[in-house]
Regions:
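Active-site-proximal alpha-helical scaffold in enzymes
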Residues: 109-135
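Conserved "HGTGT" condensation-loop signature of ketosynthase/thiolase-family condensing enzymes
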Residues: 1-108
Length: 136
């Protein structure tokens, strides 16, 4: 996919991007609610093995991203961009969670992906150049 920049930071896509996969990671309370069976996974402690909420939120984001990659049957190297947001509305948890994947991140603020309070990371990828050996 050919892309070009517009101005200093904007990207214009030659083809429309599309959502390949998504995953959701929630806490115990969300898993017990009416949509509980729709979430991919949850943690009984809400801390996901971490000592602070902020670190736990990063783990939730990373887990959601890894699960979305697995569902799409792609590796981080095959993904051009990742779009993600978090309830902190600062992108801290999202950037902490996605950092190790080394995928360029577009942080989304005031994310309202679903009408319930849960973490939902939408993994977006675009058709790769044929010389990369991957056509998504």
């Amino acid at each position: 996919m050919i892309q070009r920049t517009k101005g200093a930071q904007s990207i214009v896509f030659a083809e429309a991007p599309y959502i390949m996969s998504s995953a959701s990671v929630v806490g115990k309370k969300e898993s017990e609610g009416p949509l509980g069976e729709l979430f991919d996974t949850f943690d009984e402690t809400n801390l996901f093995g971490e000592e602070t909420w902020e670190l736990a939120e990063g783990v939730m984001q990373r887990e959601a991203c890894v699960r979305a990659l697995h569902k799409a049957n792609v590796t981080p190297e095959q993904v051009r961009y990742l779009f993600g947001g978090d309830l902190l509305r600062q992108g801290i948890a999202t950037s902490m969670g996605a950092e190790s994947l080394q995928i360029p991140l577009f942080g989304l603020f005031e994310v309202a992906l679903h009408p319930v309070r849960h973490w939902h990371l939408q993994l977006c990828a675009w058709q790769q150049d044929m010389e990369n050996g991957c056509s998504l």
